[in-house]
């Protein structure tokens, strides 16, 4: 009974939520028969979590939204800014983490970031973690020190600047 009331209340509040199946039993069974058939298991008063379909989300047309293509000029400019920042940032921590390998680490990070911006970055919401994992992996593979610190510095810069610079470049504020 409580389940039916809960479903009715949910449908009344949001008619877009409709159950795919009913949570209530299909045949009418007395409570005594139900407890006997369930082997003395007690049922909680909570409604079962049926599968609900949100038609509003299903029909919202998310498939129709297309991110813009990458902009090569933007990628080139942003890669240049990234290189400058990484060289400056890693130079600050040279003694602690990177030693004499700052330039090599900056080259690895810049190459990966540039490739990502040229091929995969399509505006706000498309900055992925993969290039930063690739940076860390490549630095480690080459036997260079400070892979986690370099990747962390790259992520911090990208989160702060890339989407903001894209909006300024395209005029979308």
From Swiss-Prot:
Subcellular location: Plastid, Chloroplast stroma, Chloroplast nucleoid
A biological-process GO annotation: regulation of gene expression
GO molecular-function terms, A-Z: DNA binding
Keyword Manganese carried by entry: no
Main location: plastid
Superkingdom of this protein's organism: Eukaryota
GO cellular component, one term: chloroplast nucleoid
Transit peptide limits: 1-55
Gene ablation phenotype (knockout): Pale yellow green leaf phenotype. Reduced levels of plastid ribosomes and defects in plastid mRNA metabolism.
Keywords, ordered alphabetically: Chloroplast, DNA-binding, Plastid, Transcription, Transcription regulation, Transit peptide
Keyword Transcription: yes
Function: Required for the activity of the plastid-encoded RNA polymerase (PEP) and full expression of genes transcribed by PEP.
Name this protein carries in UniProt: Protein PLASTID REDOX INSENSITIVE 2, chloroplastic
Naturally occurring in which organism (per UniProt): Zea mays (Maize)
């Amino acid at each position: 009974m409580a389940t039916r009331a809960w479903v009715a209340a949910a449908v009344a509040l949001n008619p877009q939520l409709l159950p795919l199946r009913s949570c209530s039993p299909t045949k009418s069974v007395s409570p005594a028969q139900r407890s006997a058939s369930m082997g003395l298991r007690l049922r909680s008063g909570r409604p079962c979590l049926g599968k609900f379909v949100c038609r509003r989300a299903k029909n919202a047309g998310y498939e129709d939204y297309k991110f813009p293509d990458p902009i090569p000029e933007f990628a080139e400019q942003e890669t240049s800014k990234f290189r400058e920042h990484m060289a400056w940032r890693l130079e600050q921590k040279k003694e602690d983490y990177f030693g004499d390998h700052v330039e090599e680490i900056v080259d690895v990070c810049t190459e990966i970031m540039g490739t990502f911006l040229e091929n995969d970055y399509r505006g706000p919401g498309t900055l992925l973690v993969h290039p930063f994992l690739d940076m860390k992996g490549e630095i480690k593979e080459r036997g260079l020190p400070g892979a986690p610190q370099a990747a962390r510095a790259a992520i911090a810069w990208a989160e702060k600047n890339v989407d903001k610079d894209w909006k300024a470049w395209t005029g979308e504020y």
